[in-house]
Regions:
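Individual alpha-helical transmembrane segments in multi-pass integral membrane proteins
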Residues: 7-26, 39-151, 171-172, 191-202
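Alpha-helical transmembrane segments
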Residues: 25-32, 61, 150-157, 205-213, ...
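Membrane-interface helix-boundary motifs at transmembrane edges
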Residues: 32-47, 99-108, 155-167, 215-222
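Short, Lys/Arg-rich N-terminal segment immediately upstream of the first membrane anchor
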Residues: 2-10, 220
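Juxtamembrane "helix-exit" motif on the non-cytosolic side of transmembrane helices
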Residues: 2, 33-35, 60-72, 122-133, ...
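Interfacial "cap-and-anchor" motif at the non-cytosolic start of specific transmembrane alpha-helices
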Residues: 160-262
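Membrane-helix interface segments in multi-pass membrane proteins
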Residues: 1-2, 204
């Protein structure tokens, strides 16, 4: 049973990161294709940056899981530092996007990017010093920072509706939960925990899309994204409902045959 749980968790991560690569790639392609119909260039650049960060995170983690499964050891600490630094900058672009239309000094945006830079520095310092990457201190700092930024968006973005502020804050809180999990023991968790903890980058991208491209652009993206997600959920459901029980049955049957022969 434990082995099947680990297989399910591994499958969740592989599917999740593959879907993440596809969705962020789709975001980048659609921004470039529909750039003349969207908002000003600064917003396009922000969404392209989001897509680039999401691709770095998901590609890095996908490669890491494949490397651990098919080869000896993990990935280079420098590659891990790049991957986790990209994840750490995603909350910053969320805050940036949330304050893009506000007048005045965007102190929360500056604070978010400062925190992301600090976390990235800690990841690369850990890699250079030969310590474990990601840096637990960096992830813990970003957990606290994400909660503080979510509170700041709720309190200080006075011009935005409560619905918008709640969506921004919820995306940041999902990231906070993910960072808190990643800063602790990451081995032997259930597939549900792995789903919540490792796939926090997807709600961040969907939040930015929903807020900035609510109409045709978001609808076009969501039609493709939902089809891809449903296909992935179907594959995972078939594994849990069909493949895993069959594998467990065959393992038990083989052990019984071996015992009878002995």
């Amino acid at each position: 049973m434990e082995m099947n749980a680990l297989n399910a968790a591994l499958l969740v991560n592989l599917i999740g990161f593959t879907v993440g690569v596809a969705l962020y790639g789709l975001v980048a392609a659609m921004v470039v294709r529909h750039r003349s119909r969207s908002k000003p260039a600064s917003v396009d650049l922000l969404l392209l940056t989001t897509a680039g960060l999401g691709l770095l995170w998901n590609l890095g983690e996908l490669y890491s899981f494949i490397q651990k499964d098919f080869a000896l050891g993990g990935i280079s600490p420098w590659l891990a530092a790049i991957s986790f630094s990209a994840l750490g900058f995603l909350p910053s672009v969320v805050v940036h996007s949330a304050q893009a239309d506000d007048e005045g000094t965007h102190w929360l945006t500056y604070a978010a990017y400062t925190l992301s830079l600090l976390a990235a520095g800690l990841h690369f310092y850990s890699a250079a010093a030969g310590n474990a990457v990601p840096s637990d201190l960096a992830l813990q700092a970003q957990t606290i920072g994400a909660v503080a930024l979510a509170s700041g968006l709720l309190l200080f973005n006075l011009k935005q509706t409560l619905e918008k502020k709640t969506i921004w804050a919820s995306a940041l809180l999902v990231f906070a939960v993910s960072a808190l999990h990643l800063s602790g023991d990451r081995e032997g968790n259930s597939w549900l925990i792995e789903l919540i903890a490792h796939q926090a980058s997807l709600p961040l991208a969907l939040t930015i899309l929903y807020q900035n491209y609510r109409f045709a652009f978001a609808d076009l993206f969501l039609k493709r994204a939902i089809s891809l997600i449903l296909l992935s959920l179907t594959a995972f459901g078939l594994y849990v409902a069909v493949a895993a029980p069959l594998l467990r049955y065959h393992e038990t049957h083989d052990r019984d045959d071996a015992s009878a022969a002995a």
